[in-house]
Every structure is written in structure tokens, then in C-alpha cells.
Amino acid sequence: MLKILNMNEYISLNHYLILSSLVFTIGMFGLFMHRKNIINILMSIELMLLAVNINFVAFSVYMQELSGQIFSIIILTVAAAETAIGLAILLIYFRNKGSIKITDINKMRG
């Protein structure tokens, strides 16, 4: 008979938390390093949201509850909608102004 491997035997909660903190740090680093380009900022924010989702799923598996996994799916859905709306706004702004630099967008203030 085939034995189904339980991944919790090999990968502990600490591994998931380390992975999550690394992904969050990469997203934070990208957020601070690429302040001029809005698309890079959106990608960095998505990385940070992914790190939060890894935490939710890891704790959900560790505590043997489904609520964290369900909440993670809801967060991913909302984040996808947020990104789609943000990119649509950026596309319209680029068609009108010809640039998507942060400095040009900050000039829109009244």
C-alpha cells in the first residue's frame, strides 16, 4: 500500500513563518526601493499580501481549522480585484498623461 505523506511531519510551523517573513521582507524592500514606478509598488504590495496569506494558511493547518484557509481565499479574491482596478486606473491615466511616474501623479493634487 502507498503511504500518504503528511507534510506536517517534515515542514513545521517555523518553516512557514520563516518563508512568510522572507516574502514579506522582499515585498517591503521592493516597496521602498521602487518608489517611482507604480506597477512595482503594486507588485510589492501583492507580495506582502501573499506573505500574510501564507501565515493564515500555516496557522490554519497547524490548528486544524479551515477558517484561516477560507479567509486566505477571500483575501486573494479581494487582492485580485484591487489589482485589476488599480491597473485599469493606471491604464486610463497613462492614456491621458503619457506617464505613470509617482512624481507626475503627485502633481494632480489641487
Curated annotation (Swiss-Prot):
Transmembrane parts of this sequence: 13-33, 41-61, 73-93
Subcellular location(s) per record: Cell inner membrane
Class of this enzyme: translocase
Classification via InterPro entries: NADH_UbQ_OxRdtase_chain4L/K (IPR001133), NUOK/Mnh_C1-like (IPR039428)
One of the record's GO cellular component terms: plasma membrane
Keywords tagged on the record: Cell inner membrane, Cell membrane, Membrane, NAD, Quinone, Translocase, Transmembrane, Transmembrane helix, Transport
Highest taxon in the source lineage: Bacteria
The protein's role, per its UniProt record: NDH-1 shuttles electrons from NADH, via FMN and iron-sulfur (Fe-S) centers, to quinones in the respiratory chain. The immediate electron acceptor for the enzyme in this species is believed to be ubiquinone. Couples the redox reaction to proton translocation (for every two electrons transferred, four hydrogen ions are translocated across the cytoplasmic membrane), and thus conserves the redox energy in a proton gradient.
Subunit annotation: NDH-1 is composed of 14 different subunits. Subunits NuoA, H, J, K, L, M, N constitute the membrane sector of the complex.
Alphabetized HAMAP family for the sequence: NDH1_NuoK (MF_01456)
Protein name: NADH-quinone oxidoreductase subunit K
Gene: nuoK
